[in-house]
């Protein structure tokens, strides 16, 4: 299929076309073929940069985490608000996500047949000899996801990369909220998405985002990690320092609460990776901690409030069995009421664990999940509200915290005692983590979707602004 001649509409309908679905997030980027259940390619949205023999080299994929190279620094092309900040890196990283697992490398592919290390000077900046080099998506229509507040400039830049750099014959840009509601089998829903860098609440009606109701705040999974760090600083019997695996050569088992007995590796300054590498590796331990230990207080009242029988909730929490966790250096401890504290501020801003060193400012009440939902519903027509409350879709990897949906249900029933509140949150972890991707996979494989694609011909005629008219 030649990239300059768009296929006929029939070739877009359903299975004849191997459309690719690309769902970039702050923590991971998901890519796969339309019609499949889960994305084949899941790569970190982080890249590594280091110098070798005087040349700058780049690393993508899981290799970023594996080897602590000298002066290796780690970056992320996405901003915390979900909008791309570094377009050059975003383009390379997205291209890696589908060429490494899905399409294979084409002759002009800058990733040199999937090998990670690139020499900056060798990357084709102009696409010289476009006719002789096949572009990476010359045979595949591309559906991409975006946040609901993505600005026009970013949307236009995305279609330019897809059409001009990758040579896709057809393109569509879909909003995350709409895709997540399709994945849940709903045309209308209130989508609560707890991602790594932010929380968003998106009202969707008949497959369209109700823009006035869209709300988002920076209290995502990375904010919870910062709350865990703040907790560790004030921990008793001793403050906890996270030492990533690459700095430990051996460890000895110790009793709970006893100082660790480990032998540490040291790197001379010229061989040591950058601080950004260490903090990314610490984040992996924090993610494990969130998965194994952290729990959301089930409610119905806040953790700081008295419970239904007059006993303070914190006392109730203390009486529940704790959860043990072992750190990479062998230090281990059982966590009691503290495991509830680190997420309580998603629902109650006053419960924030303050940390002067945190990159996150203390949240305001308006940034908490109940208030975001309230603001989202206040932004839409009164008649739609009961229908949206009966179709609340919970998605995003950070929504997998133990007890999260129970607490959300309690909060919503208190805010809206009249209408029926129904929460749809798939128990299957991959459905919850990849729901935008799954929605895109469903959408791009529908036969009726073929009239929605923007063809290369239309892009050439109307320019990048066509994305604003066609992808509402």
UniProtKB/Swiss-Prot annotation:
Keyword Transcription: yes
UniProt-listed InterPro entries: Actin, ATPase_NBD
One Pfam match: Actin
Gene Ontology CC terms, in alphabetical order: NuA4 histone acetyltransferase complex; SWI/SNF complex
Keywords for the protein's UniProt record, in alphabetical order: Activator, Chromatin regulator, DNA damage, DNA repair, Nucleus, Transcription, Transcription regulation
Domain of life where this protein originates: Eukaryota
Segment forming the signal sequence: none
Localization per record: Nucleus
Nuclease as UniProt keyword: no
Example of a GO biological process term: chromatin remodeling
Molecular function terms, GO-annotated: chromatin binding
Family: Belongs to the actin family. ARP4 subfamily.
Subunit field text: Component of the NuA4 histone acetyltransferase complex, of the INO80 chromatin remodeling complex, and of the SWR1 chromatin remodeling complex.
Function: Chromatin interaction component of the NuA4 histone acetyltransferase complex which is involved in transcriptional activation of selected genes principally by acetylation of nucleosomal histone H4 and H2A. The NuA4 complex is also involved in DNA repair. Is required for NuA4 complex integrity. Component of the SWR1 complex which mediates the ATP-dependent exchange of histone H2A for the H2A variant HZT1 leading to transcriptional regulation of selected genes by chromatin remodeling. Component of the INO80 complex which remodels chromatin by shifting nucleosomes and is involved in DNA repair.
PANTHER family (UniProt xref): ACTIN (PTHR11937)
Name used for this protein in its record: Actin-related protein 4
Organism from which the protein derives: Emericella nidulans (strain FGSC A4 / ATCC 38163 / CBS 112.46 / NRRL 194 / M139)
